[in-house]
UniProtKB/Swiss-Prot annotation:
The gene is fliL. It comes from Salmonella typhimurium (strain LT2 / SGSC1412 / ATCC 700720). One of its GO terms (biological process) is bacterial-type flagellum-dependent swarming motility. Controls the rotational direction of flagella during chemotaxis. Its main location: membrane. This is Flagellar protein FliL.
Length: 155
């Protein structure tokens, strides 16, 4: 064999192990990167907040009330947003008393005041305050988080 043939063969023999080492290093790096990526989502998944609980609504039948003003009538439908299901059950159990409290509250209203946005917001606050008191001594207060008008006619 000539010297040039030996040099070519030795150059090839150097390149083959070198390419094998580079390929193994690339595979090892890719495997490590993949493993690290799989470990990260578990820490991020724990950081997501839980979805908010479903709202609890309590729809009341509509009320028709004579106002203190002469010949004025209020027709109002109300739905209450409550804190929890226990409050809903308690209000349903004492529904006649709840309706009585609201009828008395509505009959004390002034038509001129109810015709404005501020008057309607004031009525919402009054409904929350009226229903917050315990229905029976020894029971907890009712937590009404919001009052929604479903019908509102002022004649």
């Amino acid at each position: 064999m000539t010297d040039s043939a030996i040099n070519k063969k030795s150059k090839r023999s150097i390149w083959i192990p070198l390419l094998v080492l580079i390929t193994l290093a690339a595979c090892a790096t890719a495997g490590y990167s993949y493993w690290r990526m799989q470990q990260q989502p578990t820490t991020n998944a724990k950081a997501e907040p839980a979805p908010p609980p479903a709202p609890v609504f309590f729809a009341l039948d509509t009320f028709t009330v004579n106002l203190g003003d002469a010949d004025r009538v209020l027709y109002i439908g109300v739905t209450l947003r409550l804190k929890d299901e226990a409050t809903r059950a308690r209000l349903n159990e004492y529904l006649p008393e709840v309706r009585s409290r609201l009828l008395l509250l509505f009959s004390r209203q002034n038509a001129a005041e109810l015709s404005t946005e501020a008057g309607k917001q004031k009525l919402i606050a009054a409904i929350k305050e009226t229903l917050a008191a315990p229905l029976v001594a020894g029971q907890p207060k009712q937590v009404v988080t919001d009052v929604l008008y479903t019908a509102f006619i002022l004649r």
